[in-house]
């Protein structure tokens, strides 16, 4: 103002270049430029912009309260109780009826007990005194200290995030566009007054934003973050209005103008529309001469001879996108396009991701998927004069190319689609050595937690020593049974070298002299117990068990050596000793054995001779083939279940499975203070906690829990102990827990 003695302030590029629209009723009077500026500075900002000044402006406005409640419900539900309590206190202050005040105070107090807000002891005592003594006067300001505390919490925590939220910014954008549209429509209906005699271009609409100062900058509300609504295009909600502020005005912030050496700024060359032209990344806004010429041609017909000054300003209406304009600006648009943009489409959703060039496999895959053809596919097959190759060779080449394309996906790299998420990548700062203070701060809580768990276990063992002893006995008994079963199952005897040699010699001589005399037959060495171990689990008895009964006999030459056969089968197929649920003796084998026994029974002399020889050789055999003590122990259970030579196999007695043990339970007897009849429940486990006990309560609410327990004090050996922590174990009185539940105030 001081630089212009005439009192008329010069408009720069950061302000509206035309006067405000006429006030209804004053359309006939043409205003000066100074009046339009004065009106802009005097008018107050809209209410939705005042919400950013203080929290009181927001909570005193109806629309602001609705928007703030919606934001809290969607974005910060933890502050719902704070907001509801604040408005409940505001409603309480407006009441004058004592009865209404008493009801509202009781309702607010019940709400506070159920909410997450903490109630001070003074307030709790004051409300209890009001309930017990109705003569105490009720004050609607009883919750004022707590309301101030809640207000501070809202102002410090949720109010700043609301001002930066997308919901509030979008609301400002919509309201600004709506106000601008209404202003523009009102100015169009009342006529284009106040701009014809100014000698320059004017605006058909006005800026519905905060007032500007003399320096040309916005007066932004307090607590609004930069860019909250300064860089938001208004046309995103509504269509472009007939006119608005310049492209570098208050809506879009400072302009990107040319240098100050006298060149034309971007404001002078851009069209007067609510949207800016596209400005590519890594480029400077600059318009060529062809664009200016086309712009002047578009606006030349509607502008008068005196409306276009020396600066050749653009018309005030938005120019249309025509063919001539695209052709005129084609060269310049290609020049200002960034080099990296050729052949690459920018996606706004992937602006923060890195660009990786196509690999060989990706190129082949894209070529195959798009139906790309090779040179052999495009060759002519109608004539041999085109390429000089015969038809068969061209057909063979085409077939090979087709096969290559079909197998391209099978020959691709296998790890092309393996993407490691960014959240799972290792960072260097995660493996840095911790300082001593950080290590102590992280280690102490963990050690305290371990110590607390051990203390709880120790207390539980002290209170219930019988359960620990029972558990130890069960574990030791199960370990002993398991060890015995393993020993019985895998009890193996070491093979004697002499036994192996004797068995080999007996097999060789038996094959060479099949018709030997019974009197000269040498005794067959006994089979080691490892090869005659019977299976105990399914009642299946092997040949070894048959030989242990003492009834098996060596028959004459007409009787087949069944033990040797079984020994061969056992050595050749070890799986025959496995549990199959079927006896190892088939019906055919038993029948053949019985037939052989009946045929050999006719020779009484041979039987007597064989018995005499066996009795003579028995002492020598027992001394020669002495078995270790472990062998006799392993044969005892087998001999008791062996069968006779004339019968088949006898299955072992099947023992029924033991009944499942009843899970341990703890009986808890408790009662409420106002009920004479106690409750009796069963909680699974021997060490129930308070949390488990709460789950079985028939009521829900705030209670205190007392349990009867023993005390070392001789005057009062039985006391009521209060349990507070949910993880604490309930004390037992005898073999059950005796509890008393009291409602908490």
UniProtKB/Swiss-Prot annotation:
Annotated region described as Disordered, given as residue ranges: 1-45, 183-204, 243-275, 339-401, 508-581, 593-663
Stretches with biased composition (Polar residues): 266-275, 347-357, 366-385, 561-581
Protein name as it appears in the record: Axin
Protein keywords: Cytoplasm, Developmental protein, Phosphoprotein, Wnt signaling pathway
Cysteine-cysteine disulfides: none
Gene Ontology terms: biological process: cell development; chitin-based larval cuticle pattern formation; dorsal/ventral pattern formation, imaginal disc; eye-antennal disc morphogenesis; follicle cell of egg chamber development; glycogen metabolic process; heart development; imaginal disc-derived wing margin morphogenesis
Molecular functions (GO terms): beta-catenin binding; molecular adaptor activity; protein kinase binding; signaling receptor binding; ubiquitin protein ligase binding
Record field: compositional bias (Gly residues): 188-202
Start and end residues of each RGS domain: 54-172
Family matches, as InterPro entries: Axin-like, Axin_b-cat-bd, DIX, DIX_dom_sf, RGS, RGS_sf, RGS_subdom1/3, RGS_subdomain_2
Domain DIX, chain residue ranges per copy: 663-745
GO cellular component, one term: Wnt signalosome
Modified residues (Phosphothreonine): 513
Compositional bias segments (type: Low complexity): 248-265, 640-653
Basic and acidic residues compositional bias, start-end: 607-620
Start-end of Pro residues biased regions: 654-663
Purpose of the protein: Inhibitor of the WG signaling pathway. Down-regulates beta-catenin (armadillo=ARM). Probably facilitate the phosphorylation of beta-catenin and APC by GSK3B (zeste-white 3=ZW3).
Species the sequence originates in: Drosophila melanogaster (Fruit fly)
Pfam families: Axin_b-cat_bind, DIX, RGS
Location in or out of the cell: Cytoplasm
Phosphoserine modification, residue list: 517, 522
PANTHER family given in the database record: AXIN
Main location: cytoplasm
Oligomeric and partner information: Interacts with ZW3 and ARM. The interaction between AXN and ARM occurs via the armadillo repeats contained in ARM.
Organism ancestry: Eukaryota, Metazoa, Ecdysozoa, Arthropoda, Hexapoda
């Amino acid at each position: 103002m001081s630089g212009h003695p005439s009192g008329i302030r010069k408009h720069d590029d950061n302000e509206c270049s035309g006067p405000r629209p006429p006030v209804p009723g004053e359309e006939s009077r043409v205003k000066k430029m100074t009046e339009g500026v004065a009106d802009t500075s005097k008018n107050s900002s809209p209410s939705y912009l005042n919400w950013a000044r203080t929290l009181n402006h927001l909570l005193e406005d109806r629309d602001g309260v609705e928007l703030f409640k919606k934001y809290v419900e969607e974005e910060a539900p933890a502050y719902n109780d704070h907001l509801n309590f604040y408005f409940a206190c505001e409603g309480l202050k407006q009441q004058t009826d004592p009865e209404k005040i008493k009801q509202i105070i009781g309702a607010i107090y019940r709400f506070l007990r159920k909410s997450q807000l903490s109630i001070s002891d003074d307030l709790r005592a004051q409300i209890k005194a009001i309930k017990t003594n109705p003569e105490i006067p009720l004050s609607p300001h009883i919750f004022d200290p707590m309301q101030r505390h809640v207000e501070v919490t809202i102002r410090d925590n949720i109010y700043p995030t609301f001002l930066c939220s997308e919901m509030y910014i979008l609301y400002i954008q919509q309201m600004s566009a709506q106000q601008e549209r209404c202003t523009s429509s009102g100015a169009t209906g009342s006529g284009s007054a106040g701009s014809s005699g100014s000698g320059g271009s004017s605006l058909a609409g006005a800026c519905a934003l905060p007032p500007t100062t003399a320096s040309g900058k916005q007066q932004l509300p307090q607590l609004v973050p930069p860019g909250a609504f300064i860089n938001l295009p208004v046309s995103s909600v509504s269509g472009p209005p007939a006119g608005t502020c310049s492209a570098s005005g208050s809506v879009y912030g400072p302009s990107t103008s040319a240098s100050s050496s006298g060149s034309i700024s971007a404001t002078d060359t851009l069209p007067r529309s609510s949207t800016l032209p596209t400005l590519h990344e890594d480029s400077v806004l600059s318009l060529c001469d062809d664009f200016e010429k086309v712009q002047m041609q578009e606006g030349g017909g509607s502008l008068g001879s005196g409306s276009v000054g020396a600066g050749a300003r653009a018309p005030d209406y938005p120019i249309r996108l025509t063919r001539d304009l695209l052709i005129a600006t084609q060269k310049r648009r290609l020049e200002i396009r960034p080099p990296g943009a050729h052949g690459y489409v920018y996606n706004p959703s992937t602006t923060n991701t890195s660009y990786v060039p196509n690999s060989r496999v990706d190129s082949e895959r894209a070529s195959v998927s798009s139906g790309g053809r090779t040179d052999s596919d495009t060759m002519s097959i109608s004539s041999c004069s085109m390429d000089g190759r015969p038809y068969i060779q061209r057909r063979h080449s085409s077939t090979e190319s087709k096969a290559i394309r079909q197998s391209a996906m099978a020959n691709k790299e296998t790890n092309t689609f393996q993407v490691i998420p960014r959240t799972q990548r290792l960072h260097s700062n995660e493996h840095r050595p911790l300082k001593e203070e950080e290590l102590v701060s992280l280690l102490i809580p963990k050690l305290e937690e371990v110590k607390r768990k051990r203390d709880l276990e120790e207390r539980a063992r002290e209170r219930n020593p019988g359960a620990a002893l029972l558990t130890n006995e069960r574990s030791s008994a199960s370990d002993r049974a398991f060890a015995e079963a393993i020993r019985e199952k895998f009890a193996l005897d070491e093979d004697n070298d002499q036994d192996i040699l004797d068995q080999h010699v007996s097999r060789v001589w038996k094959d060479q002299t099949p018709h030997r005399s019974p009197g000269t037959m040498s005794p067959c060495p006994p089979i080691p117990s490892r090869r005659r171990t019977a299976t105990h689990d399914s009642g299946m008895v092997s040949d070894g068990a048959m030989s242990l009964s003492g009834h098996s006999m060596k028959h004459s030459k007409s009787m087949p050596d069944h033990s040797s056969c079984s020994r061969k089968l056992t050595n050749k197929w070890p799986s025959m000793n496995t549990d199959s649920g079927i006896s190892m003796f088939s019906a055919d084998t038993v029948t053949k054995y019985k037939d052989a026994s009946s045929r050999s029974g006719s020779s009484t002399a041979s039987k007597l001779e064989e018995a005499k020889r066996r009795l003579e050789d028995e002492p020598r055999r027992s001394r020669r083939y002495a078995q270790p003590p472990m062998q006799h122990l392993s044969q005892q259970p087998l001999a008791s279940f062996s069968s006779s030579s004339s019968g088949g196999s006898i299955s072992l007695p099947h023992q029924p499975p033991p009944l499942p043990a009843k899970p341990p339970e703890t009986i808890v007897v408790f009662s409420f203070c106002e009920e004479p009849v106690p409750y009796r429940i069963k909680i699974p486990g021997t060490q129930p906690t308070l949390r488990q006990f709460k789950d079985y309560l028939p009521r829900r609410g705030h209670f205190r829990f007392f349990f009867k327990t023993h005390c070392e004090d001789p005057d009062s050996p039985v006391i009521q102990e209060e349990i507070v922590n949910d993880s604490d174990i309930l004390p037992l009185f005898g073999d059950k827990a005796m509890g008393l539940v009291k409602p908490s105030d």
